[in-house]
A protein has these predicted regions:
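Acidic/histidine-rich, surface-exposed loop or edge segments in extracytoplasmic proteins
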Residues: 57-61
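Short amphipathic alpha-helical segments and their helix-coil junctions
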Residues: 23-31, 107-123, 247-254
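Extended mid-to-C-terminal alpha-helical interaction segments
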Residues: 209-255
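DNA-contacting interfaces and partner/effector-binding or oligomerization modules
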Residues: 46, 64-76, 80-215
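Bacterial Sec-dependent N-terminal signal peptides
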Residues: 1-26
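Short N-terminal segments immediately surrounding and downstream of signal-peptide cleavage
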Residues: 23-46
Length: 255
């Protein structure tokens, strides 16, 4: 009863909430002998920031990306990933605030020419194979995702045109159980996808499991500063309780 009441409250309070699904709720594809393969371009593309558009804050000619202080681990990982997969040593710049940026004119020209049009929009037609879609989704999960419980995951992007690619990929890869929430009226506005990941998706997510845990730990530590002090401690308890209720509701929806 309590979970049902929460769902009703959530439905009334959310600006926009929908449950997307395929027409069939069949058995997920077998993953026992399924082999994962990462396409470097599309994994990297999945991680890229595009707040207010890909080139609003990123230099198209020479920059790969920019990162928040809590994303130091991903900046270092991406620099290493590029060196191993492209044989390019990037220029990683850390400023006093611990924000960071990665530069490589050669790689920037390559990926921005191949995968973005003249107006800076991602070329969707390049996502033309399962390997590319899984690779892109894995990159998105690494930077923008969260493992909530069991096979339930969350992906959240802010003021990003990437939302349409995320939804289409989840649909194409037969993610039948998906809840979408749009936070309208917030700064920034956000698109949130709650999903029950398929066994094949989980295999891909596990590739980056250790790195994701490190990033999540850094994020939690960064956000934890908000909950310092007596009032902060109370707010943290309330936040944790809401998270537990959310997970219960998602479990009920996905049942």
């Amino acid at each position: 009863m309590k979970a049902t009441q929460f769902i009703l409250t959530a439905l009334l309070s959310m600006t926009y909430l929908s449950v997307f699904s395929q027409t069939n709720f069949g058995e997920p594809k077998d993953s026992t002998n399924f082999k994962t393969e990462i396409n470097p371009d599309f994994f990297l593309l999945g991680t890229l920031s595009d707040y207010m558009g890909r080139f609003q804050y990123v230099d198209r000619e020479k920059q790969i990306d920019r990162y928040y202080p809590y994303e130091e681990s991903i900046a270092k990982y991406i620099a290493k990933f590029i060196k191993e997969n492209y044989r390019i040593v990037v220029n990683t710049v850390f400023i006093t605030s611990r924000h960071s940026e990665i530069f490589s004119p050669k790689l920037a020209k390559e990926i921005h020419t191949k995968y973005f049009d003249e107006k800076g929009r991602f070329i969707d037609s390049t996502l033309n194979s399962e390997v590319k879609k899984y690779s892109f989704l894995t990159g998105v999960y690494y930077r923008y995702g969260e493992h909530l419980e069991g096979n339930i995951y969350k992906i959240q992007v802010a003021n990003s045109p990437k939302d349409k690619e995320i939804y289409q990929i989840l649909k194409d890869l037969e993610c039948d159980k998906l809840v979408y929430k749009f936070l309208r009226g917030y700064i920034p506005s956000s698109d949130i996808f709650y999903l029950e990941a398929t066994p094949r998706m989980i295999k891909y997510f596990n590739i980056i499991g250790q790195e994701k845990q490190e990033l999540q730990k850094s994020y939690d530590s960064y956000i934890g500063k908000i909950f310092e002090g007596e009032q902060g401690a109370k707010a943290k308890v309330m936040s944790n309780d809401r998270q537990k209720e959310l997970i219960k509701s998602l479990q009920l929806i996905f049942k």
